[in-house]
Amino acid sequence: MLTIALPKGALLNESIQIFQKIGLDFSAFLDSKNRQLQITDPTNQAKALLVRATDVPVYVEYGQAQLGIAGYDVLLEKSPDVANLIDLKFGYCRMSVAVPADSPYQSPLDIPHHGKVASKFVNCAKDYFRRLDIPVEIIPLYGSVELGPITGMSEAIVDLVSTGRTLRENGLVEIDELFASSARLIAHPLSYRLDRDQIYNWVEKLREPTTSMAKV
């Protein structure tokens, strides 16, 4: 039976919807009374695991799930050994550098050497500033990253931005974009090669709704 890792949080609703379009129903995860973390599709063709968004690539990499849905940001941050198969065309956001609106820094190049940057995307932030050849200290924060510059702990932050509302409400502005992110279908590489007949069919079915969405 096919096992799929689905992410908790912002990507869950649309992840379930896209599987519904190809005949797999995991909508029980959306029931407020549901406490199960593993459910089987009513047709008994597949089961789904409900896991933290950052853990989806882990379950896929270690073979506990053959397919999964993960944000491109998570894939860049974690660099898992998985096959990145399809851009699913939802969950759009961007990874940005932001500073206080009254900051003298108008560009990342203005951030002083050995300045401090708060982020929960430590690897993405390190890679970005390394490419710019700017030595900075990355401070790992895993909640309310905006408080870094507000409290004076950091000069800037690197974080995901969707509408930008949270930044604006906390007096922050974007000064650069690292990359755009969206939901991706990922697969366990060995399973995708060895069990290609089963997995390939599902992957091709998933390409159809995403192709249609791209044409709208």
Swiss-Prot record:
Pathway in which the depicted protein is active: Amino-acid biosynthesis; L-histidine biosynthesis; L-histidine from 5-phospho-alpha-D-ribose 1-diphosphate: step 1/9
InterPro entries linked to this entry: ATP_PRibTrfase_cat, ATP_PRibTrfase_CS, ATP_PRibTrfase_HisG, ATP_PRibTrfase_HisG_short
Main location: cytoplasm
EC code: 2.4.2.17
GO biological process entries: L-histidine biosynthetic process
Record keywords, A-Z: Amino-acid biosynthesis, ATP-binding, Cytoplasm, Glycosyltransferase, Histidine biosynthesis, Nucleotide-binding, Transferase
Record carries keyword Thylakoid: no
GO CC annotation, single: cytoplasm
Assembly behavior: Heteromultimer composed of HisG and HisZ subunits.
Family: Belongs to the ATP phosphoribosyltransferase family. Short subfamily.
Domain characteristics, as noted in the entry: Lacks the C-terminal regulatory region which is replaced by HisZ.
Protein name: ATP phosphoribosyltransferase
